[in-house]
């Protein structure tokens, strides 16, 4: 899967081209692009995305405060769509306590990671997104953008290009008929990108005397855990019957639109 990585000066930048989808057709090269944040990319990278990759839509899955703190760099000729797919319930006392402790941690990013891990919410993040109103409305809009795109590439991102972005990639690959094992392999490529970060965070957490539960969440904090996505997809299947039914009924992508997507993004 080395062909998925693209060297454009953005962390975790990959394209979904080459995977086998419905009827044995392949996902088109360089038209479905997933990345980490693009707020600090160079002018050269922005121009390359416009001229070489023909990016026509940028989809930003971050929350409002993330976008305000680090606005996207403008890509010439591309529409920028903000779709927050995760809006945590800040009336939840567990999350309120976490936010207070993270605020107390100040600039200590490691302590913030520890406080996040202690909530035990990491394992349920993808399930929360897929079942939430903001997640379903957001990914429905994402599919609308994919359907509206006629002559270029769509780039989507969050902060690190792993969770909200990874779920979006999984959904479009499902819609295109890509095998679930391949979808999971693509999802896990994030760990190759962030392997040094994962190792460094684990070492730091051990040095701080963190318990096994917190240390065990290292990969989910700095990378991704496949079992967490599997659990979310299994929950969707249990409630709705299949991922395709979820895409049709919860995200509003009709059978005709699914076929349209396949004609647009497979070859």
Where in the sequence are the language-model features?
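Ser/Thr-glycine-rich phosphate-binding loops at phosphate-binding pockets of nucleotides
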Residues: 159-160, 164-165
């Amino acid at each position: 899967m080395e062909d998925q990585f693209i060297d454009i000066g953005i962390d975790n930048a990959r394209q979904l081209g080459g995977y086998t989808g419905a009827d044995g057709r392949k996902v088109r090269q360089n038209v479905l692009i997933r990345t980490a944040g693009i707020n600090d990319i160079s002018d050269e990278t922005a121009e390359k995305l416009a001229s070489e990759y023909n990016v026509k839509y940028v989809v930003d899955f971050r929350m409002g405060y993330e976008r305000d703190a680090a606005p996207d760099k403008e890509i010439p000729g591309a529409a920028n769509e903000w779709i927050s797919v995760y809006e945590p319930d800040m009336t939840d006392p567990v999350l309120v306590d976490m936010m207070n402790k993270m605020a107390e941690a100040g600039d200590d990013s490691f302590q913030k990671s520890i406080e996040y891990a202690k909530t035990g919410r990491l394992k349920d993040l993808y399930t929360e997104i897929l079942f939430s109103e903001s997640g379903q409305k957001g990914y429905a809009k994402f599919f609308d953008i994919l359907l509206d795109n006629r002559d270029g590439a769509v780039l989507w991102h969050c902060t690190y290009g792993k969770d909200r972005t990874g779920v979006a990639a999984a959904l479009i690959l499902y819609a295109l008929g890509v095998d679930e094992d391949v979808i999971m392999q693509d999802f896990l490529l994030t760990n190759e990108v962030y392997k040094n970060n994962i190792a460094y965070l684990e070492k730091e957490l051990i040095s701080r005397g963190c318990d096994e539960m917190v240390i065990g969440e290292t990969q989910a904090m700095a990378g991704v855990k496949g079992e967490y996505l599997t659990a979310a997809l299994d929950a969707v299947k249990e409630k709705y019957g299949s991922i395709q039914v979820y895409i049709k009924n919860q995200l509003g992508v009709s059978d005709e639109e699914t076929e349209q997507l396949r004609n647009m993004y497979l070859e």
